């Protein structure tokens, strides 16, 4: 391959960059023979500007591997001294899917711009300019977040796949690397059932909006129902499998919607926490939205409505007016269903088994 300095003097590369640097959608079509869907175009256009920060709900069937391959390939070509770091928390199937599309982009590109092979190559980690610049993949594992540290470049792009499952510590490490004038980050994920964490915050408290001009992230919410890659038959099958179109799973995995429980509870007059003492002498506190969500889910399934609809119409009014109703409902919930949300205020006097069902509960 030619040296790095040569590419910046090559009129063929200069002409390519001049034509496509501000229109990656056109580049995908003319260089890779890929007509991006209207949803994929939104993602590309969101991450295209210098120093862009974008967060996207990516339900099933919007063509995420393909669009991530297009973005990674174009970023590497437009900025040879760049680094694209793709962080993924699951199996290597994610990596293989993206790299397969990178190969497709590469093969189409060589037919249109054969000179490009003088500077770049495609390998197991995607498109590379040299040993240190280009694409790389980092397999995220909880408690081993340091494995994604140490990535620096004049042009740096982090793509976080399944962002809802990445720990806050991992995000802290990512942000510590984003020190250059062009540090971009793209978060993609299906919304998780639990409305906590960095991905959730990127769509709410850290979202850039008219009422939040100090926000960081451009927010994109996509629905598989609007995807040209999804058939009605698939949607019908998914709805049947996951409890109907009003089910929480359908709303998250197809409509790309967050449950909305947290916001509804915070905006209501309902108490926000429950404090309780265990028979072993320990004292605990728990967000009341956990109890409210359990109540709303139970009744929503019986009446064929969404959890959020039942929460707003029945659970919140009930729990606001009658605190004893909260306690009585909490008694029906197994400890294992709520233990992860509880915070210990006072340790137990001994190591007796914790008994949530018989604990004294005080609404605050």
Regions found by a protein language model. Name each.
Residues 1-2, 269-273, 361-364:
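Short intrinsically disordered terminal tails
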Residues 97, 253, 294, 313, ...:
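Generic alpha-helical secondary-structure signal
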Residues 2-268:
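Phosphate/NTP-binding elements of NTP-utilizing enzymes
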Residues 284-314:
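Short, flexible N-terminal segments of the mature chain
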Residues 65, 90, 288-290, 306, ...:
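Alpha-helix N-cap recognition
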Residues 303-364:
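Short, mixed-charge low-complexity intrinsically disordered segments
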Residues 269-291:
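Short, extreme N-terminal segment that most often corresponds to the first beta-strand
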């Amino acid at each position: 391959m030619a040296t790095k300095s040569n590419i910046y003097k090559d009129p063929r590369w200069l002409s390519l960059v001049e034509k496509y640097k501000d229109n990656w959608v056109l580049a995908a079509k003319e260089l890779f023979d890929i007509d991006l869907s209207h949803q994929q175009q939104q993602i590309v256009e969101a991450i295209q500007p210098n120093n862009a920060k974008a967060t996207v709900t990516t339900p099933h069937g919007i063509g995420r591997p393909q669009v991530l391959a297009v973005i990674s390939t174009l970023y590497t070509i437009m900025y040879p001294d760049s680094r694209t770091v793709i962080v993924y928390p699951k199996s290597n199937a994610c990596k293989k899917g993206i790299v397969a599309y990178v190969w497709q982009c590469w093969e189409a590109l060589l037919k249109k711009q054969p000179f490009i092979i003088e500077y770049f190559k495609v390998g197991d980690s995607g498109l590379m300019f040299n040993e240190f610049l280009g694409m790389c993949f980092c397999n995220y594992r909880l408690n081993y977040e340091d494995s994604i540290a140490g990535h620096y470049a004049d042009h740096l792009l982090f793509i976080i796949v399944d962002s809802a499952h990445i720990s806050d510590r991992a995000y802290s490490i990512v942000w510590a690397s984003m020190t250059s004038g062009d540090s971009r980050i793209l978060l993609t994920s299906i919304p998780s059932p639990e409305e906590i964490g960095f991905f959730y915050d990127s769509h709410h408290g850290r979202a850039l909006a008219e009422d939040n001009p100090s926000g960081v992230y451009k927010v994109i919410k996509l629905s598989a129902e609007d995807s040209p890659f999804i058939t009605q038959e698939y949607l019908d099958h998914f709805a049947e499998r996951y409890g109907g179109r009003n089910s929480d799973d359908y709303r998250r995995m197809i409509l790309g919607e967050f449950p909305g429980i947290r916001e509804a509870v915070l905006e209501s007059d309902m108490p926000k926490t429950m404090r309780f003492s265990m028979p072993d002498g320990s004292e605990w506190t728990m967000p009341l939205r956990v109890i409210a969500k359990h109540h709303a889910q139970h009744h929503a399934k019986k009446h064929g409505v969404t959890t959020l609809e039942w929460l707003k119409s029945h659970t919140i009014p009930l729990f606001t007016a009658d605190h004893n109703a909260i306690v009585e409902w909490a008694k029906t919930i197994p400890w294992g269903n709520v233990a992860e949300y509880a915070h210990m205020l006072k340790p137990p006097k001994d190591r007796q088994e914790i008994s949530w069902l018989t604990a004294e509960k005080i609404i605050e």
